[in-house]
């Protein structure tokens, strides 16, 4: 019996898994239904043995999870949950039932300019948001742009995406900090600088691909087409394309600035948003804060026990302590699926110091004031730091708390409370690291030698799902 005709099966008592929607290079995607709500979902199933056999596959899966965790936007397909058994990994994602934008173009040909503009506006909103989180898609094409039941665009397939984090968060420092060096994507949509394979700006490469998509929406075909690959590359390098006569003057002017071979001369995201053609009937999409995606559950009520007469009230005058388990798990990084089952509510950074907590706290406060941050003491070993200037999403606010592991060992934890997540990461790496290097013993994750580890501390009851393969 074909997999697409199999009866529904149950995954972890939470989802009914139904028909096969599609098959990729190393995954199968099924239609599913959340049992408690009846909501439709898409479930990507990956066999672990396929992951371990293929070099770089674990890294790719880890990257896709990390990327999609950062992105909560109405025009980006949402990753809802990650689960695993001994043999399989399951991505539970938003189900988008309107099909691919590619299918619409293939079926209907060119779109009316107003409809093409709407999809381009939503694409730019989504891609600009991704860039603000440090994510470059690198494979933007109509096949990776889906349409929902309301006719709105959704960006999907982050398997090739590059997550640009500062050093210590997965990125690397060097003379070409901001350049990517992996040739990804589909040739007809790929920017000239990517094809040259000499390093490129991921944001500008995505903008080129957005230009290709806009051309395809308006024309019904691609701007650069040739059966000979080398001839195709030559056309892309020179941006040799013709505009059909039905293109409006305004759309041609925008495309002429999008499809520029030199990325330094190519139009930027902020400039695109100022173009009158783009702004016509534009309604900005409202992104969701990553901190608001899943609220923290309320603490269960507990009975207050009577205090011993000799027991002191916790007035916050001394630092909280870390036990050994908390310390080890907090300072460890690497690919651990069990860490991916919970939505991370607050982006955190942490370092250890061989100085007493009191000394660390004083040094931290001095450094914050030198960085022109407002400092407010929440309690004796916890403070709130706030930038005086507005950032991309308001003023960056961070809490810093000092914990005592031993009399001469302290842990400092930074946690973003408001503002832009990428701005927060850059604050930790570019401002805090240099300012506190004299007291830091080790930053979280810096000592990990293996980028990929395995962990079987997950639900291993494979009998809960029998028919998905």
From Swiss-Prot:
SUPFAM superfamilies: Protein kinase-like (PK-like)
Domain called NAF: residue spans: 317-342
Reaction equations catalysed: L-seryl-[protein] + ATP = O-phospho-L-seryl-[protein] + ADP + H(+); L-threonyl-[protein] + ATP = O-phospho-L-threonyl-[protein] + ADP + H(+)
Region called Activation loop, residue ranges: 157-193
Alphabetical list of Pfam families matching this protein: NAF, Pkinase
Function (record text): CIPK serine-threonine protein kinases interact with CBL proteins. Binding of a CBL protein to the regulatory NAF domain of CIPK protein lead to the activation of the kinase in a calcium-dependent manner. Downstream of CBL1, CBL2, CBL3 and CBL9, regulates by phosphorylation the K(+) conductance and uptake of AKT1.
Family, per entry: Belongs to the protein kinase superfamily. CAMK Ser/Thr protein kinase family. SNF1 subfamily.
Keywords annotated in UniProt: ATP-binding, Kinase, Manganese, Nucleotide-binding, Phosphoprotein, Serine/threonine-protein kinase, Transferase
Residues recorded as bearing Phosphoserine in the entry: 161
Annotated GO biological process: hyperosmotic salinity response; signal transduction; sodium ion transport
Top-level EC class: transferase
Residue ranges of domain Protein kinase in the record: 15-278
Stated name of the protein: CBL-interacting serine/threonine-protein kinase 16
Organism: Arabidopsis thaliana (Mouse-ear cress)
CC cofactor: Mn(2+)
Ranges of biased composition (kind: Low complexity): 454-469
Stretch list, region PPI: 346-376
Classification via CDD domains: CIPK_C
Domain comment (free text): The activation loop within the kinase domain is the target of phosphorylation/activation by upstream protein kinases. The PPI motif mediates the interaction with the ABI (abscisic acid-insensitive) phosphatases.
Record PTM Phosphothreonine, positions in chain: 182
Subunit note: Part of a K(+)-channel calcium-sensing kinase/phosphatase complex composed by a calcium sensor CBL (CBL1, CBL2, CBL3 or CBL9), a kinase CIPK (CIPK6, CIPK16 or CIPK23), a phosphatase PP2C (AIP1) and a K(+)-channel (AKT1). Interacts with AKT1, CBL1, CBL2, CBL3 and CBL9.
């Amino acid at each position: 019996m074909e997999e697409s005709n199999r009866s529904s099966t149950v995954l972890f008592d939470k989802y009914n898994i139904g028909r096969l929607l599609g098959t990729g290079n190393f995954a199968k995607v099924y239609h599913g239904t959340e049992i408690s709500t009846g909501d439709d979902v898409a479930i990507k199933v990956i066999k672990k043995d396929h992951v371990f056999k293929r070099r770089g596959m674990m890294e790719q899966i880890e990257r896709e999870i990390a990327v999609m965790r950062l992105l909560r936007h109405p025009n980006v397909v949402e990753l809802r949950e990650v689960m695993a058994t001994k043999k399989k990994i399951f991505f539970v994602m938003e189900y988008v039932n309107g099909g691919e934008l590619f299918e619409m173009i293939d079926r209907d040909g060119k779109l009316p300019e107003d409809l093409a503009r709407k999809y381009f506006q939503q694409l730019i909103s989504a891609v600009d948001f991704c860039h603000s989180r440090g994510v470059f898609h690198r494979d933007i094409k109509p096949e990776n742009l889906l349409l929902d039941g309301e006719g709105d665009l959704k960006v999907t397939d982050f398997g090739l995406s590059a997550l640009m984090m500062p050093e210590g968060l997965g990125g690397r420092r060097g003379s070409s900090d901001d350049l990517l060096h992996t040739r990804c994507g589909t040739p007809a949509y790929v920017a000239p600088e990517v094809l040259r394979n000499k390093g490129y700006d991921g944001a500008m490469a995505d903008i080129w691909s957005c230009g290709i998509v806009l051309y395809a929406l308006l024309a019904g075909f691609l701007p650069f087409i040739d059966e000979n690959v080398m001839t195709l590359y030559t056309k892309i390098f020179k941006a040799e394309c013709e505009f059909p006569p039905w293109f409006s003057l305004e759309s041609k002017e925008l495309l002429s600035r999008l499809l520029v071979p030199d990325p330094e001369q190519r139009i930027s995201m902020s400039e695109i948003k100022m173009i009158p053609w783009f702004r016509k009937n534009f309604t900005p999409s409202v992104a969701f804060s990553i901190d608001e995606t899943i609220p923290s559950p309320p603490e269960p009520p507990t009975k207050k026990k009577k205090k011993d007469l000799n027991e002191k009230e916790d007035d916050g005058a001394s630092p909280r302590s870390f036990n050994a388990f908390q310390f080890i798990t907090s300072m460890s990084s690497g690919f651990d699926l069990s860490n991916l089952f919970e939505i991370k509510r607050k982006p955190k950074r942490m370092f250890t110091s061989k100085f007493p907590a009191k000394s660390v706290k004083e040094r931290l406060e001095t450094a914050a004031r030198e960085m022109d941050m407002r400092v407010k003491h929440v309690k004796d070993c916890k403070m709130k730091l706030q930038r005086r200037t507005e950032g991309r999403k308001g003023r960056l606010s961070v809490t810093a708390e000092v914990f005592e592991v031993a009399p001469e060992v302290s842990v400092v934890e930074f946690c973003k409370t408001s503002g832009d997540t990428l701005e927060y990461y850059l604050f930790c790496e570019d401002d805090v690291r240099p300012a506190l290097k004299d007291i830091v013993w080790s930053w979280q994750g810096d000592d990990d030698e293996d980028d990929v580890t395995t962990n079987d501390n997950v639900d291993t009851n494979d009998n809960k799902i029998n028919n998905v393969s």
